[in-house]
Amino acid sequence: MSYKLYNDDCVNVCSQLPDDCIDLTITSIPFANLYTYSDDPRDFSNVKDLDEFFAQMNYLIPELYRITRPGRIIALHLMQIPTFKGRDGAMGLIDFRGMVIKAFQKHGWIFHGEITVFKDPQIEATRTKSASILWNSYKKFAEITRTGMPDYVVLMQKVEREDEWIHVTHDNIDD
């Protein structure tokens, strides 16, 4: 078994890789402009809105498809994006998970499955200070409170050329 780890801009790395060379990609893509990771203008987190984010993703997603071997998976760590009353006019959620799935499907990927990663709402409340999850908000304005937000690992599969799939097999360990 061999593997390689890359620490570089994903668009740079993908463009240099040959076709059908990756068995598994595990990534946590930026959640649009929810967090800013650097001041680099190429950074996907430095977008002004979701439209700009998905316009940028439209360059990366086909490259990920090209370099992924047929039948293999990309695992995407995601979360829903909260909206804020001051910025967005109301507190709620944007279905970022669904938007990412649709963006990948547009480029030929198949939605293969997902894993829900439940998080402790008390830790989330302490970390984010989000009024919608704080106990004090619940006591005063219960109608604005929500549950804690889980993360998701969305699994997308490259389904093409099934006759070329290299099947994964496991020896029976009971023998």
Task: Enumerate the predicted regions with their spans.
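Core catalytic lobe of class I
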Residues: M1-D175
